[in-house]
């Protein structure tokens, strides 16, 4: 009984905390890729200061009671205060469950929007490397790179249909490549080696599952790229 009462008090305190601090947005559209483990969500965020997104941002979204997940918006438009989330729902968890149940006109609540500290370096070649969970991050990076000819990269994707849809949906120099290993780092380093990037003038931006990001960083260093030319952002274990 005592434990149950304490739990109720914590939930009540948490609800008060959330009601004071949370901001809200509205779902404009939800698109489920086939198979529906990739979910594309268009949002209107009237309170977001989108015109000052000079580094790749992340949104700390409320996905359940006192439960939050960080998602990277892409395709943002400061005039309309809109953006799109790309959520990899292939694994179980509160974020995936939340995304799968979203519908048009639902209200989305979020705690804050902050920077990932990823912004394009002033170098001739910006290379983005990621997986399904970092699709939004890679597309956001592409959006920020000017001129666009400086940008290239690859996203490792397990599902063949998703790779085909990516090529259809986006005008992007990002290549969707087949996942031939569990975490994806071996597939990505093989792709990098085939591109023969310039050792001195290439900066890599890595984002995705922690194992892939960590191992890919090691493999790039073995290829001769220094730490100063490798920027990392790990999302999940």
Region locations from a protein language model:
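Extended, composition-driven regions rather than compact fold-specific motifs
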Residues: 1-237
């Amino acid at each position: 009984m005592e434990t149950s009462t304490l739990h109720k008090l914590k939930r009540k305190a948490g609800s008060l905390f959330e009601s004071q601090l949370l901001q809200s947005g509205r779902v404009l559209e939800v698109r489920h890729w086939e198979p529906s483990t990739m979910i594309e969500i268009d949002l209107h965020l009237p309170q977001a200061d989108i015109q000052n997104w000079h580094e790749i941002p992340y949104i700390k979204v409320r996905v359940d009671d006192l439960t939050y997940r960080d998602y990277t918006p892409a395709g943002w438009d400061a005039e309309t205060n809109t953006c799109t989330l790309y959520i990899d729902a292939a694994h179980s968890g509160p974020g995936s469950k939340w995304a799968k149940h979203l519908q048009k006109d639902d209200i989305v609540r979020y705690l804050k929007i902050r920077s990932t500290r990823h912004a394009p370096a002033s170098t001739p070649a910006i290379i983005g490397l990621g997986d399904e969970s970092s699709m939004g991050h890679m597309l956001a990076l592409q959006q920020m790179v000017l001129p666009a000819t400086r940008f290239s990269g690859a996203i490792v994707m397990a599902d063949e249909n998703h790779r085909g849809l990516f090529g259809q949906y986006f005008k992007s120099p990002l290549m969707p490549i087949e996942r031939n290993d569990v975490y994806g780092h071996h597939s990505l380093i093989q792709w990098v080696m085939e591109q023969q990037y310039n050792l001195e003038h290439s900066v890599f931006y890595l984002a995705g599952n922690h194992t892939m990001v960590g191992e890919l960083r090691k493999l790039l260093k073995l290829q001769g790229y220094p730490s100063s030319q490798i920027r990392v952002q790990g999302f999940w274990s």
